[in-house]
Design a protein with these regions (language model features):
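DNA major-groove recognition helix of helix-turn-helix/homeodomain DNA-binding modules
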Residues: 53-66
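Short glycine/serine/threonine/alanine-rich loop segments
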Residues: 26, 37, 66
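Recognition helix of helix-turn-helix/homeodomain-like DNA-binding domains
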Residues: 35-52
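Short basic helix-loop element that most often maps to the first helix and adjoining turn
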Residues: 15-30, 34, 59
């Protein structure tokens, strides 16, 4: 399996997660706790380093109210 490349979509999704998380007053640790991942994983999502799967994105959207 080849390496995954960061895409513009991954970056935009991550940026939107960060903006909404901060707007809701949540830390990376708290958001991670709520979706059962580490704060490091939230950092990777927000930086666009790791792609957010659809199921996890749905959980994040529900928590952030979008």
């Amino acid at each position: 399996m080849g390496g995954k490349r960061r895409t513009a979509v991954d970056s935009v999704v991550g940026r939107n997660i960060r903006v909404l998380r901060l707007d809701r007053g949540l830390s990376q640790t708290e958001l991670g706790r709520r979706i059962e991942v580490t704060f490091q994983q939230i950092q990777k999502y927000e930086n666009g380093t790791n792609r957010v799967g659809s199921g996890r994105l749905f959980k994040i959207a529900s928590i952030l109210g979008v």
